[in-house]
Regions:
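Anion (oxyanion) recognition and catalysis
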Residues: 28, 65, 110
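Short, well-structured N-terminal submotif of metal-dependent ribonuclease cores
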Residues: 1-36, 49-62, 134
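A generic structural signal for short hydrophobic patches within well-formed alpha-helices
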Residues: 11-12, 41, 123-124
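Acidic, PIN/NYN-like endoribonuclease modules and their adjacent C-terminal/linker elements
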Residues: 106-135
Length: 135
């Protein structure tokens, strides 16, 4: 597999042992590179601490290190792409109902021309290429 952009939903599915955990881990292990928006790192860290307590961020960091996930800085170009994604697919505007951080993942996938690794159906209602999760 080529590179992927990981959405927060995929990382949290792996971290919290949700049903698609194994498929997400396979996709991450095959990705070269696996990218994560710095905005989504913030979101994942907050959710990890909220759900797992003080050890949550360290567990997330171990997951990111184990799969060599690269943190991509969120740039002005990404911001413009994310705004466009919100106009086209945002919550209250489109059935995909992307939130702000979904739009950040969308923008990084678009900018890097990599498929998006996500769990759930929101992104399937957009035009972004998705990683097919098997298993």
């Amino acid at each position: 597999m080529s590179g992927v952009v990981a959405d927060t939903s995929a990382l949290l599915a792996a971290l919290f042992a949700e049903p698609q955990r194994d498929a997400v881990l396979v996709a991450l292990s095959e990705a070269d590179p696996a990218l994560l928006s710095s905005c989504c790192l913030l979101e994942a860290t907050i959710v990890a601490q909220s759900r797992l307590g003080p050890e949550g961020p360290a567990e997330l960091e171990r997951l990111l290190e184990a799969f060599n996930v690269e943190i991509a800085a969120f740039t002005a170009d990404h911001s413009a792409m994310a705004c466009d994604a919100w106009r086209r697919f945002g919550k209250g505007r489109h059935p995909a109902a992307l939130n702000i951080l979904d739009c950040c993942s969308y923008a990084l996938a678009q900018a890097s021309r990599q498929p998006l690794l996500a769990v759930g159906q929101d992104f399937a209602r957009t035009d972004i290429e998705l990683v097919e999760l098997i298993g």
